[in-house]
Amino acid sequence: MSVQTYDDDYARDRAAIEDLMARYLFALDYNDLDTFIAMFTDDAVFDFARGRIEGKAAILEAVQSFKARIGEHYKDEDGNPAVLRHVLAHTAIRVEGHRAWTRAQWFEMANDGPGKSLKMGTFGIYEDKLERVDGRWLFSERRILNEFLPGRESGPGNPIRDMDALAG
């Protein structure tokens, strides 16, 4: 395992990457797909429950389709589309020059419980590769693991050790 070092730029890079990750979730949850797709490199890979997608146009099309299907699945008790919100728990970020890797735990909640109460729906881990392009951090690969879907779980090893092995 290689050890993360923290140079003078690490705090700035980490802040920019954390900001990107938060903006990603706001864009996704509020259906701002123009902002969402602008966060990816042109040749990005998006690996999620419906498969591995390559390239911005294909990613956008897949996410639009997925969001439409999710809207049909999550309903409040009156039959209206539920409000879905994603939350990041804790994030590890490794930066080396113009490349970075993240591991972050996430969960999703919706108001589809009794009395429109919140109910945790899904949870998992984001495994990201990022590139700094023209001074801006972008996702070059985002792999979304879902702990409740067979074949999409994390582990069995510590995800941070796996990230460090990739970087080192």
Task: List PLM regions with ranges.
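Short, low-complexity N-terminal intrinsically disordered segments enriched in polar/charged residues
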Residues: 1-39
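A beta-strand edge to alpha-helix "cap/lid" segment located at domain peripheries
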Residues: 2-5, 72, 79-168
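Charge-dense, low-complexity intrinsically disordered segments
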Residues: 7, 11, 53, 117
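Binding-site signature for planar aromatic cofactors or substrates
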Residues: 15, 19-21, 60, 155-158, ...
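Short, charged/polar micro-motifs that form catalytic or ligand-binding hotspots
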Residues: 26, 49, 116, 120
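A solvent-exposed, acidic/Ser-Thr-rich amphipathic alpha-helical stretch
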Residues: 33-107
